[in-house]
UniProtKB/Swiss-Prot annotation:
Homotetramer; dimer of dimers. The lineage of its organism: Bacteria, Pseudomonadati, Pseudomonadota, Gammaproteobacteria, Alteromonadales. Pfam families: DHDPS. Pyruvate binds at T45, I203. Pathway: Amino-acid biosynthesis; L-lysine biosynthesis via DAP pathway; (S)-tetrahydrodipicolinate from L-aspartate: step 3/4. InterPro entries: Aldolase_TIM, DapA, DapA-like, Schiff_base-form_aldolases_AS, Schiff_base-form_aldolases_CS. Catalyzes the condensation of (S)-aspartate-beta-semialdehyde [(S)-ASA] and pyruvate to 4-hydroxy-tetrahydrodipicolinate (HTPA). It comes from Shewanella sp. (strain W3-18-1). The gene is dapA. This is 4-hydroxy-tetrahydrodipicolinate synthase.
Length: 294
């Protein structure tokens, strides 16, 4: 399965809010050219919460089409209703994804028993590899390593994206889940340490705009070269924090637009475009990361 530098891809939109498929194709080509190891389409950064299911599936399918087998595409299949997640999973199973990424059900705060039942039911609806996704800062539920370990025996649940930023969890997850279970960081700021401690990859927001540099850092960390990984990570650290000066993906879409990667930075309500007070902060962070701003 997929290791390394994985982009949590933005979903480009036109000024009227419709999907900008021409920009989406350019983004896919950009990541292939820059050496990104895989793409996650329509996850959190791809605005999954504001795409209706039919549009969600269409964007993932088009991403797969544009990739044309040159880079693996993982489709987001999370929902806070298990039946809806199963319906989405069945639809995504038909479009050629290499895997799926399922966030823990949000808002309704399931217990560990509920999380286990949810993920087992979703996994049973497909034979495509499933990656669990823990991001309590958004979902209001924190899936503990012990709960993840209960799902290791499900044949097509192959890993977890852990986005708490708690580095101690890497060791605990590895102890409980074994060496074959994939561990992916979902926190750019701690990704280097995560990989050096035995993680397999990073599903990254910053990777949208610094893919070559981010991959170089990931490759160094995966090779165990801590000194090189640190030297490559240091110029990017200001970017990691500034990309969260407002809710993700507001800043990264604005940055991608300023780079000329997408036609406009439109984002769907209830999110709004980046406030002016953040513009200078983000331009400064981009400049320090050696990103050309247009």
């Amino acid at each position: 399965m997929i290791n390394g530098s994985i982009v949590a891809l933005i979903t480009p939109m036109n000024s009227d809010g419709s999907i900008d498929f021409a920009s989406l194709e350019r983004l896919v080509e950009f990541h292939i050219d820059q050496g990104t190891d895989a793409i996650v389409a329509v996850g959190t950064t791809g605005e999954s919460a504001t795409l209706p299911m039919s549009e969600h599936v269409t964007v993932v399918a088009q991403t797969v089409k544009f990739a044309a087998g040159r880079i693996p595409v993982i489709g987001g299949n999370g929902a806070n209703a298990t039946a809806e997640a199963i319906e989405l999973t069945k639809s995504l199973s038909k479009v050629g994804v290499a895997g799926m990424l399922g966030v823990t059900p949000y808002y309704n705060k399931p217990t560990p028993k509920g999380l286990i039942a949810h993920y087992k039911a979703v996994a049973a609806s497909t034979d495509i590899p499933q990656i669990l996704y823990n991001v309590p800062g958004r979902t209001a539920v924190d899936m503990q390593p012990e709960t993840v370990a209960e799902l290791v025996g499900v044949s097509n649940i192959i890993g977890v994206k852990e986005a708490t930023g708690d580095i101690a969890r890497v060791k605990r997850l590895r102890e409980l889940c074994g060496n074959d279970f994939k561990l992916y960081s979902g926190d750019d700021a701690t990704a280097r340490e995560f990989l050096l401690l035995g993680g397999n990859g990073v599903i990254s927001v910053a990777n949208n705009i610094v893919p070559k540099a981010f991959k170089a850092m990931c490759d160094a960390a995966l090779a165990g070269n801590a000194e090189l990984a640190l030297s490559l990570d240091t110029p990017l650290r200001g970017l990691y924090s500034t990309l969260f000066c407002e809710a993700n993906p507001i800043p990264v879409k604005w940055a991608a637009h300023r780079m000329g990667l997408i036609k406009c930075g439109h984002i769907r309500l209830p999110l709004t475009e980046l406030s002016e007070q953040c513009h200078g902060l983000l331009i400064d962070a981009m400049t320090r990361a050696q990103i050309e701003v247009k």
